Amino acid sequence: MNTTAKCSLSALVLLLLANLQAAHAADQPNILIVWGDDIGYWNISAFNHGMMGYQTPNIDRIANEGALFTDAYGEQSCTAGRAAFVTGQSPFRTGLTKVGMPGSDLGLKPEDPTIAEYMKTRGYMTGQFGKNHLGDLDEHLPTNHGFDEFFGNLYHLNAEDEPEHPDYPKDPAFRERFGPRGVISSTADGQIEDTGPLNKKRMETVDDEVTARALDFMERANDSEKPFFLWWNSTRRHVWTRLKAESEGVTGLGIYPDGMVEHDGHIGQLLDKLDELG
């Protein structure tokens, strides 16, 4: 769940990378957008110049090869910020101002335009991978709003692990009505698969899963000789993130810096794939 300050991430890591070398036509560059979660601008070494005690060289690479923004506006919640980006509209217009929760009917509506729908009309393969937070119901899924493929979770992490809490209601009817869905895999042809819960253990590696899916999507788009529009959304560095053993202790500064380094590594994989395909 993002605060206004932390949503400055939207201005920094809402990164539009046009890989012109890999483009299939001069007017159709591949487009990769990367988002994190609960990341402030000062958590990125391009801004803090090492003052946080760790480096984010892959994110810094985007700043060095592109632009570094020093003025930004962030919405007050994850749902509002993501809705503003994907629709290009104020959340007051779409109604997506609050944090989306399991069991809620709040989400993208059929009449809400999305950038993915537009990119489809331009001949792009469209994929969204990672955290969505734009609605709980099937009708809200990205694959009903312009994306060819989606793989990811639907809420903030502390909503995902609620059923593991000892005081979570034991009534099956409550779980059915208000329990979180798992990690969803869906396609625009209507196929929807719940791949299992995003429990505390899976949180350690879910960004690995999401990144692998994104890399595969990039490969398939390249093989199909189609430009791609890819929106990648990690769960790092949400405040409730759990890290896998290999990521713990890499900075010696605690779980948040360790998670930032892991997050930067995932972005590096995506950038390397762009270079490879080019």
Model-assigned labels for residue ranges:
Residues 1-7:
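N-terminal secretory signal peptides that target proteins for export/translocation
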Residues 8, 22-278:
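Formylglycine-dependent sulfatase
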Residues 8-19:
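Bacterial N-terminal signal peptides
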